[in-house]
Amino acid sequence: MILGIDVSEHNGMIDWKYLKEWGVGFAILRLGYGKGHLDGRFYEYINGALGVGIPAGVYYYSYALQEKEARAEAWFSAYVLQDCGVTPERLPLGVWYDMEDADGWKSSHGMPDNEEITAMCGAYTKEMARYGYPCGVYASYDWLMHRIDRKQLSPYMSYWCAQWGSTCDFPGAAIWQYTDHLEIGGKVYDGHW
């Protein structure tokens, strides 16, 4: 298995060369969140990871409550990737649509039902595919099993499952987030296999 991390501006300055030497084999970087909010360190991170040869992917933390908002999040994602010159070929881990409610925003603004959550995942991933970017869905094990109707999405959809512990119970997870506390050089990251 290959060790990976995901990062956002909350991780601060990152020594990408050190991470590569330590054995990090891939990184998934937060591109942005919500209605057109760019992660404050995205350009720095994408250039840093690719600059030292760490294979990368990106994720977009969704605040969408309906399909049209999910499509707008995809348009913004594609715009940013094109703006920084990151073609699909330079992004081997693709694009991931982060569907969760970790900060309670969806709950406090009218949590969509499962049908709408599934439709938003489909809308974002289809829109990114139109731009040529392979795209999958990130969610917790619970959301993948109980909130997202995977039968309504493409049979070729990839899933990145967050389930902390020693095993991943989600069948066929492309990436498994096994911890939110992977310490490398005194800094803490989310860890993945």
Q: Model-derived features: where do they sit?
A:
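Functionally critical loop-and-helix segments that line ligand-binding/catalytic clefts
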Residues: 1-11, 17-21, 150-193
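Substrate-binding cleft of extracellular glycoside hydrolase catalytic domains
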Residues: 1-125, 129-131
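Hydrophobic anchor at the start of a short beta-strand
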Residues: 56, 134-136, 159
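Short beta-strand/turn micro-motifs composed of small residues
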Residues: 60, 139, 163
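Glycine-rich, charge-decorated loop segments at or immediately adjacent to ligand/cofactor-binding or catalytic sites
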Residues: 69-72, 144-152
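Short, solvent-exposed loop/turn segments at secondary-structure junctions
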Residues: 102, 142-144, 166-167, 180
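Basic/polar, cationic surfaces and motifs that engage anionic cell-wall
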Residues: 107-113, 137-138, 148-156, 185
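Aromatic-lined carbohydrate-recognition surfaces of secreted/lumenal glycan-active proteins
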Residues: 128-146
